Amino acid sequence: MRHVGDRGEAVVAAWLQTQQCQILAQNWSCPWGELDIIACDPGGVVLFVEVKTRGSYNWDRDGLDAISPSKQRKLILAAQAFLESQPQWQEHPCRFDVALVRHQRGAYHLHHYLAQAFTLDSIK
């Protein structure tokens, strides 16, 4: 299953680069979990991108339902850990995005990109 996720993340990273984003890290891990993609957009905003890759027929709205409030909290804690470990990015504004990738018969494509899918306030 990790292979499917890796392919989906590669599609999203490539798309972000076409949007002039700089990829800062992929699969960054800490005790809180893993951040799929960390990027910086042309305006200097640090993007924490959660990628969900699913087949055409799935039960969780292409992975969107898997981004529960609990998952959001873990992503926020992981993002804080990343920023603590990388002080050069601490003063930049940050955003939490979700990328939904579909795969069918070996083909992967970015189905939907949700910029600012959730915020610190959305999980209170």
Curated annotation (Swiss-Prot):
Pfam families associated with the record: UPF0102
Family matches, as NCBIfam families: PRK12497.1-3, YraN family protein
Listed GO MF terms: nucleic acid binding
SUPFAM superfamilies named in the record: Restriction endonuclease-like
PANTHER family: UPF0102 PROTEIN YRAN (PTHR34039:SF1)
Superkingdom, natural source: Bacteria
Organism this protein belongs to: Thermosynechococcus vestitus (strain NIES-2133 / IAM M-273 / BP-1)
Family per similarity comment: Belongs to the UPF0102 family.
Protein name: UPF0102 protein tll1737
Taxonomic lineage from the root: Bacteria, Bacillati, Cyanobacteriota, Cyanophyceae, Acaryochloridales
Residue ranges of the TM segments: none
